[in-house]
Swiss-Prot record:
Signal peptide: none annotated. Belongs to the TrpC family. This is Indole-3-glycerol phosphate synthase. Its EC number is 4.1.1.48. It holds the Pfam family IGPS. Pathway: Amino-acid biosynthesis; L-tryptophan biosynthesis; L-tryptophan from chorismate: step 4/5. GO terms for molecular function: indole-3-glycerol-phosphate synthase activity; phosphoribosylanthranilate isomerase activity. It comes from Chlorobium limicola (strain DSM 245 / NBRC 103803 / 6330).
Length: 258
């Protein structure tokens, strides 16, 4: 069984529990009191020479185990702002990434940048939950969804005010995302089946993006040369988590600030 299959199997159990919390009903009851979402897409659009940075707040991963032992999401977010981040990505998956909804809620409350919920969304209830906990955007992974689900979830997210980063790994998934109407597409350089990484994945797919779509490169970015290659390939933004911890070189990169 692949990493992704294991994660999705567990996520189905989580969704079964989430049904009991009735997030759609709670959203309907509270929607008039919820604050407007911050402009995630606007903060990602590149308008100059430098890339935008989505800085990921992540404690652990299935492939590496615990990455940050003295994990403090507030301190991490503060340091990322100092680096020039335009948005935060917060892991909320508990079992595989040791994430938490609490981390997202705390970061959203403490700082001014838009926040994307990084999780494995396979059910509309998770989308309503994301809005309730304060996310400004969600991640939808093409490999985890049917094409019809992707279209429906993009529409639902738009209706309740959430931006969506649609994640792809190959040309077929990119075409699926484009046909579904994705406005922000991220190429994950990490293969979710075996967790191998290649920066060429993003670079090779970039020419096939629809015009006007915000382009994001994710995973495997660990050096200034990596950032330069992605910038030359005309991406708008990068999403970096582990690299900001293991590569001090990335701390000296100049990012386009919000």
């Amino acid at each position: 069984m692949t990493y992704l299959a294991k994660i999705l199997d567990e996520k189905r159990h989580e969704v079964a529990e989430l049904r009991k919390q009735r997030p759609q009903q709670r959203y309907e009851e509270r929607k008039n009191d919820l604050s407007s979402c911050r402009d995630f897409a606007g903060n990602l659009k590149r308008t100059g020479e430098n890339l935008r940075l989505i800085a990921e707040i992540k404690k652990a991963s299935p492939s590496r185990g615990v990455i940050v032992h003295d994990f403090d999401p507030v301190d991490m977010a503060r340091r990322y702002i100092g680096l020039g981040a335009s948005a935060f990505s917060v892991l909320t998956d508990r079992l595989f990434f040791q994430g938490s909804i609490d981390y997202l809620e705390t970061v959203k409350l403490q700082f001014h940048l838009p926040v994307i919920r990084k999780d494995f969304i396979i059910d509309e209830r998770q989308i309503f939950e994301s809005r309730l906990i304060g996310a400004d955007a969600i991640l939808l992974i093409v490999a985890a969804l049917e094409a019809s689900q992707l279209r429906d979830y993009l529409q639902l997210a738009a209706e309740i005010g959430l931006a969506v980063l649609v994640e792809v790994h190959d040309r077929q998934e990119l075409d699926t995302a484009a046909e579904a109407g994705a406005g922000i597409i991220g190429v994950n350089n990490r293969n979710l089946k075996d967790f191998s990484v290649s920066l060429d994945t993003a670079i090779d797919l970039r020419p096939h993006f629809p015009e006007g779509v915000i382009a994001v490169a994710e995973s495997g970015l660990k050096s200034a040369d990596d950032i330069q290659r992605i910038g030359q390939a005309s991406f708008d933004a990068v999403l970096i988590g582990e690299g900001l911890h293991v590569s001090p070189e990335l701390h000296n990169v100049t990012w386009q600030k919000p």
